[in-house]
């Protein structure tokens, strides 16, 4: 048992899916996993372990932002021996050719967070995905008839930015989309020598102002989840 995860040794699989929303973790466990058992309810951040096509897989909610996901990733790796971490979540498109409900695979993650500046004594670090997981996810998506967008994303600390046009600078440099966790995930995976990948579904577009409803997100984001489960 760790501070924020109430699981016993052996309760968590070596591969863990990481939705930000704990209710999405519960939904995945109840609808896509066989023989799913809840191992964590601490702070309402549900965690489940079950089986997908015979493979043992866990799914653990992380909350929003780099500090929150960093807590769970640290504990999953150091206390429970997790080897593969796959974030599944939503993002906002920064490019006109990336539409709502598209799949984005994060090859790397730029960030406006200071967390790596602190860790690396003021220097920059380039948080990068596991190539092994990235290739598997890309190939599986194509096999499923999906053409994912692959590239650099932005991990931001600010959901409500004081400058609503600040995203345009990142877009100018080819950043595909914005979310709030991946730079933290990839950095910790590198620190501990494990594999990590982020697969995202576009929930809204900063370019066009389009957005999906909560109901649409629940229905249309299953492609992302199925890609993650297939490569688990």
UniProtKB/Swiss-Prot annotation:
Annotated site location: Important for catalytic activity = 217
Matching entries from SUPFAM superfamilies are given as: Purine and uridine phosphorylases
Q: Which UniProt keywords apply?
A: Glycosyltransferase, Transferase
Question: What's an example of a GO molecular-function annotation for this chain?
Answer: purine-nucleoside phosphorylase activity
| Chain residues that bind a purine D-ribonucleoside | 4, 179-181, 203-204
Q: Which EC numbers characterise this protein's activity in its record?
A: 2.4.2.1
A GO biological process held by the record? purine nucleoside catabolic process
The enzyme's main class, written as a single word, is: transferase
Q: Where is the active site?
A: 204
Q: Which residues cross the membrane?
A: none
Catalytic reactions on record: a purine D-ribonucleoside + phosphate = a purine nucleobase + alpha-D-ribose 1-phosphate; a purine 2'-deoxy-D-ribonucleoside + phosphate = a purine nucleobase + 2-deoxy-alpha-D-ribose 1-phosphate
Q: What does this protein do?
A: Catalyzes the reversible phosphorolytic breakdown of the N-glycosidic bond in the beta-(deoxy)ribonucleoside molecules, with the formation of the corresponding free purine bases and pentose-1-phosphate.
Q: What's this protein's family per the entry?
A: Belongs to the PNP/UDP phosphorylase family.
Q: What is this protein called?
A: Purine nucleoside phosphorylase DeoD-type
Organism for this UniProt entry: Caldanaerobacter subterraneus subsp. tengcongensis (strain DSM 15242 / JCM 11007 / NBRC 100824 / MB4) (Thermoanaerobacter tengcongensis)
């Amino acid at each position: 048992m760790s501070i924020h995860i109430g699981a016993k040794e052996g309760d968590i699989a070596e591969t863990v899916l990481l939705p930000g929303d704990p209710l999405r973790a519960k939904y995945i466990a109840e609808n896509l996993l066989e023989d799913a058992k809840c191992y964590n309810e601490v702070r309402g951040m549900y965690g489940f372990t079950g089986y997908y096509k015979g493979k043992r897989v866990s799914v653990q909610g992380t909350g929003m932002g780099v500090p929150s996901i960093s807590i769970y990733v640290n504990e999953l790796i150091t206390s429970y021996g997790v080897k593969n971490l796959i974030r599944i979540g939503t993002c906002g498109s920064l490019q006109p050719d990336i539409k709502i409900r598209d799949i984005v695979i994060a090859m790397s993650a730029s960030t406006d967070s200071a967390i790596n500046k602190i860790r690396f004594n003021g220097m920059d670090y380039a948080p990068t995905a596991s190539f092994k997981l990235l290739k598997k996810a890309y190939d599986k998506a194509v096999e499923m008839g999906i053409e994912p967008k692959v590239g650099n994303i932005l991990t931001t600390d600010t959901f409500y930015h004081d400058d609503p046009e600040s995203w345009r600078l990142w877009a100018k440099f080819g950043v595909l989309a914005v979310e709030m966790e991946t730079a933290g995930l990839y950095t910790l995976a590198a620190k501990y020598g494990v594999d990590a990948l982020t697969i995202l579904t576009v929930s809204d577009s900063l370019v066009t102002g389009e957005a999906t409803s909560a109901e649409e997100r629940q229905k249309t984001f299953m492609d992302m989840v199925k890609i993650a489960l297939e490569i688990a």
